[in-house]
Amino acid sequence: MRNVTPFKGWRSVGLVLLGWLLVCLAGCGPRTPAPLGQALPVSASLAGLWRVQADDVGGIRAQVLNVEVSNGEFATLQWQPEAAEGLPSVRAYVRQLGAQQLLFVETGDAQKGYYFAALTSVSDHEIVLTAPNEKRLKKASKALGGKLKYQSHWLHREAHLDSGLLEKILEQKSGELFTDGIRIRLQKVVR
């Protein structure tokens, strides 16, 4: 069984999603060893600079993210130099799981994994992501016979669950899982 970690707080994202976008965008989504679901292409029109803002998250207010798309399979994300000192670039993948489109972003840390958020809306000029609501994740996990385990870190606490359980939750309860989750808005910077 693989371990999956819901990341609590997009606060770390700014420090890490960035240590990391979504410890990278790291901050608000379950951690999984690999992206789940059917691969979807990443449009080349998404390449460029994006201003990132998140509701109730002090760490990633109005930060700028450079997005590169080379082959349509993934996007490479890199925070702009003033916000990215020492942070590696990471890859982001778009997946379809059930009715839900998800963005998986590499954690960029030594534990290797991915954080995820739901793609609420996508256009060439604006992307809105919603992080999973941890209370709803815990409730859904319990309803399906699973249990979240917590690991504390310096700035946050992560919940862990195996990827099989996460997949069941996403297939059966994805509508509930993202209700009241932190919203992350990316707006394209026009030069």
What are these regions (language model features)?
Residues 2-17:
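Bacterial N-terminal signal peptides that target proteins for export
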Residues 29-45, 53-64, 72-191:
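Calycin-type beta-barrel ligand-binding domains and close structural analogs
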Residues 24-27:
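C-terminal motif of bacterial Sec signal peptides marking the signal peptidase cleavage site
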